[in-house]
From Swiss-Prot:
Belongs to the RimM family. The PRC barrel domain binds ribosomal protein uS19. Its main location: cytoplasm. This is Ribosome maturation factor RimM. One of its GO terms (biological process) is ribosomal small subunit biogenesis. NCBIfam families: 16S_RimM. Binds ribosomal protein uS19. An accessory protein needed during the final step in the assembly of 30S ribosomal subunit, possibly for assembly of the head region. Essential for efficient processing of 16S rRNA. May be needed both before and after RbfA during the maturation of 16S rRNA. It has affinity for free ribosomal 30S subunits but not for 70S ribosomes.
Length: 181
């Protein structure tokens, strides 16, 4: 089943504990740095397979930025806060600020990759951080099984065009024929 744009959510973290007696919660954040999760409000919190909206009233980094605590609107005591432990925290894509590149890495997952010659190379399944240049893992089913190709994400050298709206990436890359010697 295709999900509509309205159904898309970006998971930023999870509530993983309670803090104090006034309803504050501890957050495991996937953002970098961790406290960047506090830049977004409202949060969508998944409670028993249902997304609920919460405004972030206050928040701060703890232990030198290693953990984050937040006070959410409507959660005013320790017992109520405890009910949210384990719940995912998400935002809607439109809450993200614009980027210089015009896209986020997560938007590349699922994009169809084609070479300048028009060859279908497969779909982006992962972005691998290598230090020098991040790398797209592109996978395609073939007669020989699943073919995985790694393409360095270097704009204008290997990556010629990225269109996240149509989920298309054009690359200057050729698959090597495994039968050639």
């Amino acid at each position: 089943m295709m999900s509509s744009k309205q159904d898309e959510k970006i998971i930023l973290g999870q509530i993983n504990g309670i803090y104090g007696v006034q309803g504050w919660v501890k957050i495991f954040s996937h953002t970098d740095p961790r406290q960047n999760i506090l830049s977004y409000s409202p949060w969508l919190v998944k409670v028993k397979n249902e997304w609920r909206t919460f405004q972030v009233e206050e928040g701060r980094a703890q232990q030198g930025g290693k953990s984050v605590v937040a006070k959410l609107e409507g959660i005013d005591d320790r017992d109520l806060a405890r009910e949210y432990i384990g719940c995912e925290i998400a935002i809607l894509p439109e809450q993200l600020p614009a980027t210089e590149e015009g896209f986020y890495w997560m938007q590349l997952i699922g994009c169809q990759v084609t070479s300048v010659e028009g060859e279908d190379l497969g779909q982006v399944t992962e972005i691998v951080e290598t230090g020098a240049h991040d790398v797209l893992r592109v996978e395609k089913q073939s007669d020989a099984g699943l073919v995985s190709t790694l393409i360095p994400f270097v704009m204008e050298t290997f990556i010629l065009d990225v269109d996240v709206e149509s989920k298309q990436i054009q690359v200057d890359w050729q698959l090597e024929d495994a039968t050639e010697s």
